[in-house]
UniProtKB/Swiss-Prot annotation:
GO terms for biological process: photosynthesis. The gene is apcE. This is Phycobiliprotein ApcE. One of its GO terms (molecular function) is lyase activity. It is a peripheral membrane protein. InterPro entries: Globin-like_sf, PBS_linker_dom, PBS_linker_sf, Phycobilisome_asu/bsu, Phycobilisome_asu/bsu_sf. SUPFAM superfamilies: Globin-like. The lineage of its organism: Eukaryota, Rhodophyta, Florideophyceae, Rhodymeniophycidae, Ceramiales.
Length: 885
């Protein structure tokens, strides 16, 4: 399945191999415990043997050439095999201060056919079937070089594994090479060479039995892995046609840190069963709630330990518990609830939009319990976890991941996922269907602004600022050019050198005759070479350089003043200087640095992926200086600026253009206001035109929407029917809880209060006071928020406005902190303001026209915030006056 778009790509470095220390520590970390005594002893043993392992690796490295030569002479005849080793891979270092026994092998590597034949007879190892000595001349020099290189690589991997203390690096890099070498020459010959290398390496440590055991152990593993067949890929088959079928090479799973599978068995001890239950808590609640909060499901745990309840049903029960509901359902919108549920119960993220729509509809129709049942009863859960296995995170190195949700998958599997309120997958899937934005191919945050450039991927917890970019190889970003459109270099490359005139930027050009410069646009500047030098510094560095920095580029400036180098060469030397590299190359990411240099030298941002990839290739292959030469020697630079023109801004992004335009307009309006005569305010306040009634009414509204006139007052009277009374009850729920009660509660918590209100036993005011003091209101609007936010929500629900000032917030905060929520609600409902505005039988509503002008913006912001979408405190912005603060 071809995917044309993918999510943002975080920096992921797969584990290349395992070491003894990392494997021990990670196992304890996965179980959320300290290292046990046996594990500590293993670490001590490994660390104590570190010096011995380093000595063994050092001796093997010093004798690498001879070991490779002995192995090559075993399988090659008719010439000197070692002469084809292009360069020695081992580094010979002089150890003056290290007292260790220097062991070296001696021998003549220039052997002949007779010695090779005798060595085959003397060898104790049985020759593998199909082995024949290889003639050097017939084999060819190219193949000989590759074969000697491969033998040296085998020895190098062996030393890596010895130092790491784990043969995993051999399994990852050697397994499967047999098929590859069989296609090139002979795998049997490679086996014979490795055996000879083992024999020679062991003979080095003739007086060190422990070193011989270590070398023989790792050589045996190397030969076994080489002779073993290659691993098959891990296939992830899918049951639906809307999701990808995936394939992962086994080396990724073998090199990575394996996740421990926690499987409940009746034969386990009580302690082992407890560890399985803790793993379930860590997977579902993302932490061990027994250790963190002293919470546990004692009855369910006892049933699991007794065998009457499976792990699958245990996961189902704790997922439906009030603890899970409070932590991962109530604080989030439904879209995010679905994403987190996939992480907790299936160990992965969403795969497609169709999958999201399916489970979102289940959550909407059947609630959280229905969603959990659908996930746990799915075929995928049964295939991966069955009845007794605790779910686990199926991330990198566990199984293949989809490319279209690569970035958000990693973000979801992080520990910080519950802190992100915004749904990521549905936002990403919706972006797939949108038109191409005018952005850089490397990310949304990569638009080349004057203050923001390069590969910048902002990581935000509140807003998805790192979205996908559907750019292919041949997609080009839209850039704006000052001046006529017919001068665009895309449609008219010959017009690159044409001056735009007064429509474009100021162009500084050196006159090669008298060593002065002229400006096409600004004729009042003096013909001083100092000006053009300053223009070059401003263009290259973006500022004037300091005196300390100037000392390192003074020699280039002197050459330029004496007309020994041109403007282009002067810029070349400046960009290659240590000052420029320390500012704009060494501390930045490569993409970010290339973007900046490209913009400074060519006067425009890069067009897209294809253009910037060629700079990547030059930097990695030939270095930084070659990339600078490539830019300054390019046909675009020569046609646009030549040798004696200072580069200038030729193209700009639309976002940067808008940014500069807004700032210019703001600056112009500010200066114009300052220069205006302030004494004319009386004259300017006179009305010159004749205004109609509609014009006056429009001015009175002051930009406020018509919503303030479109409200309905729900009032309970003696003549109200049963239907009207039910409408009043629903209006109260919508005002106090900001939504219908049935959307988040069972609906029968206040059945007795509703009957009393319908039977006229209590008033609307008393009914509101009772539901405001209920546990449901406390759970929704008191427990999740700080006191200041509770006060804001309380005035919104019961008085229809935001807090008037800080003094009012402090007053209610004292009541809330000392007497609790019930007293706070009682004070609000029984206040003079409530009685004057609403009385005893009117449902509170949003008060538009009666609000003071200073408090209107805060009330507007408070009411426009979606229900429970933000816990941000709306701080009133009042002028500090006595009594207000």
């Amino acid at each position: 399945m071809i995917v044309n778009a993918s999510s943002e790509s975080p920096r992921v470095q797969p584990q290349l191999y395992r070491t003894a220390s990392i494997s021990t520590i990670v196992q304890a970390e996965q179980q959320d415990r300290f290292l046990q005594l046996g594990e500590l002893n293993d670490l001590v043993t490994f660390l104590n043997s570190g010096t011995k392992r380093l000595e063994i690796a050092e001796v093997l490295s010093k004798n690498a050439d001879i070991l490779v030569a002995k192995a090559a002479d075993k399988i090659f005849v008719g010439g000197s095999a070692i002469s084809y080793l292009e360069r020695p891979q081992a580094s010979f270092v002089e150890f003056d201060n290290i007292s260790m026994t220097q062991k070296e092998m001696s021998g003549n590597v220039q052997v002949n056919l007779l010695s090779n034949t005798s060595s085959n007879v003397i060898s104790n190892d049985t020759l593998p079937p199909g082995f024949k000595p290889i003639n050097v001349v017939r084999y060819g020099s190219t193949r000989m070089k590759k074969s000697l290189r491969d033998l040296d690589w085998f020895l190098r991997y062996l030393t890596y594994a010895i130092i790491a203390g784990d043969p995993n690096i051999l399994s990852v890099n050697i397994r499967g090479l047999k098929d590859l070498i069989s296609n090139a020459c002979s795998s049997a010959a490679a086996t014979v060479a490795l055996r000879e290398m083992r024999k020679s390496a062991i003979s080095i440590f003739d007086n060190d039995l422990s070193a011989q055991e270590i070398v023989q152990q790792y050589f045996n593993i190397l030969i076994t892995e080489f002779d073993s067949p290659s691993l098959t890929d891990k296939i992830r088959r899918r049951t639906s046609t809307d999701v990808q079928g995936l394939r992962l090479p086994q080396i990724y799973s073998k090199s990575g840190i394996p996740l421990q599978r926690f499987v409940m068995k009746t034969s386990l001890s009580n302690e082992e069963k407890s560890s399985v239950l803790k793993a379930c808590y860590r997977q579902v609640f993302e932490r061990d709630i027994a250790k963190a909060y002293n919470l546990s499901f004692v009855d369910l745990e006892s049933q699991v330990k007794n065998g009457s309840l499976s792990i699958k049903e245990f996961i189902r029960r704790i997922g439906k518990s009030s603890v899970y509901r409070k932590q991962f359902y109530e604080p989030f919108v439904n879209s995010r609830v679905v994403e987190l549920a996939f992480k907790h119960f299936l160990g992965r993220g969403l795969s497609s939009l169709e999958e999201f729509q399916k489970y979102f509809s289940i959550l909407s129709l059947r609630g959280l319990n229905g969603l959990i049942d659908a996930l746990i009863n799915s075929l995928e859960y049964a295939d991966y976890f069955a009845e007794e296995t605790c779910p686990y995170l199926r991330g990198l190195s566990e199984e293949p991941l989809e490319s279209r949700n690569w970035g958000v998958q990693f973000s979801l599997l992080n520990y910080s996922a519950p802190f992100r309120k915004v749904p990521q997958f549905i936002t990403l899937f919706s972006d797939y269907k949108m038109s191409l934005p005018d952005q850089h191919p490397y990310g949304l945050g990569n638009d080349h602004l004057a203050l923001q450039f390069g590969a910048i991927f902002p990581n935000s917890l509140t807003a998805l600022s790192n979205k996908s970019a559907f750019f292919g190889r041949y997609t080009r970003r839209i850039l704006l050019r000052q001046g006529p459109g017919i001068y665009s270099q895309i449609s008219n490359p010959q017009a690159r050198s044409k001056s735009i005139g007064s429509l474009g930027p100021k162009i500084f050009k050196l006159n090669s005759i008298d060593n002065t410069y002229f400006s096409d646009e600004v004729m009042s500047l003096p013909p001083d070479i100092e000006q053009i030098i300053k223009a070059i510094y401003l263009r290259v560095f973006g500022r004037f350089i300091y005196l300390e920095e100037l000392s390192s580029v003074r020699k280039f400036e002197s050459l330029f003043r004496s007309s020994k180098i041109s403007v282009r060469d002067f810029i070349r030397n400046l960009v290659k200087s240590s000052v420029f590299r320390s500012l704009y190359w060494e501390p930045l990411y490569i993409c970010k640095a290339i973007e900046y240099i490209h913009y400074r030298l060519l006067g425009r941002p890069s067009y897209g992926r294809q253009e910037i990839n060629q700079y990547f290739d030059i930097v990695y292959r030939e270095g930084y200086y070659k990339m600078i030469d490539y830019l300054l020697n390019s046909s675009e630079y020569i046609r646009s600026f030549g040798d004696n023109t200072v580069p200038y801004e030729r193209y700009i992004t639309s976002a940067n253009m808008i940014l500069k335009s807004n700032y210019s307009n703001f600056l112009y309006s500010t200066l114009k206001t300052k220069n205006s005569n302030s004494k004319k305010f009386i004259e300017l306040s006179n009305i010159l035109e004749k205004r109609s009634l509609n014009s006056i009414q429009a001015r009175i509204s002051q930009g406020v929407s018509t919503v303030r006139d479109q409200y309905k007052v729900f009032q309970l009277t003696q003549l109200s029917s049963q239907v009207d009374k039910r409408q009043v009850v629903k209006a109260i729920y919508r005002q106090i809880f900001e939504r219908d009660l049935n959307s988040f509660a069972i609906g029968d918590e206040f059945i007795n209060l509703e009957k009393a209100l319908v039977n006229n036993n209590i008033t609307v005011q008393q009914f509101i006071e009772q539901i405001g003091s209920s546990s449901l209101y406390g759970r929704e609007f008191y427990q999740p928020y700080p006191n200041t936010k509770v006060i804001e929500l309380g005035t919104k629900h019961f008085l229809g406005r935001a807090p008037n000032n800080q003094a009012e917030i402090r007053y209610y905060n004292q009541i809330l902190a000392s007497q609790g929520l019930s007293s706070f609600i009682t004070v609000l409902v029984n206040s003079n303001e409530y009685n004057q505005v609403f009385g005893v039988n009117i449902v509170p509503y949003r008060r538009f026209t009666t609000l003071p002008a200073a408090n209107f913006p805060n009330t507007e912001k408070l009411y426009n915030t979606l229900t429970k979408q933000s816990s941000e405190i709306i701080v009133p912005s009042f002028i500090v006056v006595p009594g207000n603060q």
